[in-house]
Amino acid sequence: MSLKILLAEDDNDMRRFLVKALEKAGYKVLSFDNGASAYDRLREEPFSLLLTDIVMPEMDGIELARRATELDPDLKVMFITGFAAVALNPDSEAPRDASVLSKPFHLRDLVDEVNKMLAA
């Protein structure tokens, strides 16, 4: 069974690149352009990893991650953002063990980071 990744990223081009890179690495990826839609899907089926941008319409990535890990405490979370400081702020409600990949990044780095998280 391939591991499933839920991707929330509001930038269409970025979302397409990420899906392509992760599928090529052997993952099954479902992607959404906002946090609210991603959360609705998460309530329907389990995922191994939530990969989310932080700044998005309707529900930001930190809120999405908070709600998602309430729903499934075993869900791993990775933020992809240009605002790494926001996710790493200890006062934020981001899950403590979430990892952060700052934009810009190479797709290879993303895949390596995802592989590491899902192997843990």
Predicted regions and their residues:
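Receiver (REC) domain active-site loop signature in two-component systems and cognate sites
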Residues: 56
